[in-house]
């Protein structure tokens, strides 16, 4: 992301904070685009709370063929809405159960205190079931070659193959079905 794009994003967030008691922003986009990195930078600079869509992967019993055939259904958006967004919209502390991939199960509850600014980062953050909860929606993109380079550097060649075969096609289907790059308030290159 260019410094100018980052500054523009900060300006938009600060303007929202000047006008509203609470702000909830979503950072969606392609894997490897820098969503987690951007959220961490914003958290350090703005003292906000951050929630990761990776903590809301589907549990094994939810991964039905019918569900996965629908764009954007590769995340437990129902649980995310009830455990995170509804309390955040009320200005309350959030208690949620992160999904742990290694165990394929929900972990012990985590409580995050209320904050004026809440950032939600990760693929599927702008799912239609969650869309209206946000004051700002950001789509982060990356070109295909750089995406693969970043994923391999972060996860290794074995995981890269899984991303190419499974995760990237699921994400791209979701982005296309809901026209996210065009619908989000901001589309930035990560």
Which residue ranges define each predicted feature?
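Extreme N-terminal, non-catalytic leader segments
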Residues: 1-25
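P-loop (Walker A) phosphate-binding loop of NTP-binding proteins
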Residues: 30
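Conserved lysine of the Walker
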Residues: 35
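Hydrophobic positions on the alpha1 helix immediately C-terminal to the Walker A/P-loop
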Residues: 38
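Short beta-strand-centered segment that lines the nucleotide-binding/catalytic pocket of NTP-utilizing
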Residues: 46-61
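Conserved nucleotide-sensing/catalytic segment adjacent to the nucleotide-binding pocket
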Residues: 62-105, 117
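ATP-dependent NMP and nucleoside kinases share a basic, alpha-helical "lid"
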Residues: 104-154
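Small-molecule kinase domains that catalyze NTP-dependent phosphoryl transfer to phosphate-bearing small molecules
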Residues: 105, 109, 127, 132, ...
């Amino acid at each position: 992301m260019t410094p100018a794009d980052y500054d523009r994003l900060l300006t938009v967030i600060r303007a929202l904070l000047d006008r509203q008691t609470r702000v909830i922003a979503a950072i969606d986009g392609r894997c490897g685009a820098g969503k987690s990195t951007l959220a961490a930078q914003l958290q350090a600079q703005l003292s906000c709370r951050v929630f990761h869509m990776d903590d809301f992967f589907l549990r094994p019993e939810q991964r039905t063929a019918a569900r996965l055939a629908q764009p954007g259904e590769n995340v437990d958006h129902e649980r995310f809405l009830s455990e995170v967004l509804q309390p955040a919209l009320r200005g309350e502390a959030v208690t949620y159960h992160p999904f742990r991939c290694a165990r394929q199960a929900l972990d012990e509850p985590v409580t995050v205190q209320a904050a004026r600014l809440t950032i939600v980062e990760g693929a599927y953050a702008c799912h239609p079931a969650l869309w209206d909860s946000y004051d700002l929606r950001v789509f982060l993109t990356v070109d295909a070659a750089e995406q693969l380079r970043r994923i391999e550097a972060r996860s290794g060649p074995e995981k890269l193959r899984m991303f190419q075969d499974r995760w990237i096609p699921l994400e791209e289907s979701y982005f296309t079905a809901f026209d996210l790059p065009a619908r989000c308030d901001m589309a930035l290159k990560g």
